[in-house]
């Protein structure tokens, strides 16, 4: 087994710890992400039902409603999100899910774009809401292709700054090669938050 800070003594690879470290490095190097406070972002992984390249690779779930409100109207009913808290009791504002092994089987560049795609959804106010664009498609703006071109630009700028090479090395591995080198892939598994009626 190769030495890696994300491998435990029992030779399992802590994927969610690794993902957090990649995001930490991105935020430190890209000023557009400086508003993100990772201590209030939870990372989780979900087992992909099928080993295919198609389908969801990652999602970002906001834990509050528009404008950072603690509740909102859904189908005529006022609801709030069942809260998720950090170990020190602070409210988690965002939940980042990665789908394994589908995410791991992307190319290194695709992994970077996927991670940045989800981080860019975080509101500039870091208030638990999504970044909202004008128009009907407020999540991805009027052009999702332009959104992803911007993420590719961010990924290229991050790589140009010569980040931690071990992070890049792991990102270049697919799921089979990752397990062969470091062992079984594990990590935090957090259920999607429930919407519950207010009061």
Please place each PLM-identified region on the residue numbering.
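Metalloprotease/metallohydrolase-associated module, dominated by Zn2+-dependent proteases
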Residues: 2-92, 96-97, 125-199
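Short pre-active-site segment immediately N-terminal to the catalytic Zn-binding motif
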Residues: 97-114
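Active-site recognition of the HExxH zinc-binding catalytic motif
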Residues: 113-125
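Generic "edge-of-domain/loop-turn" microfeature
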Residues: 50, 103-105, 121
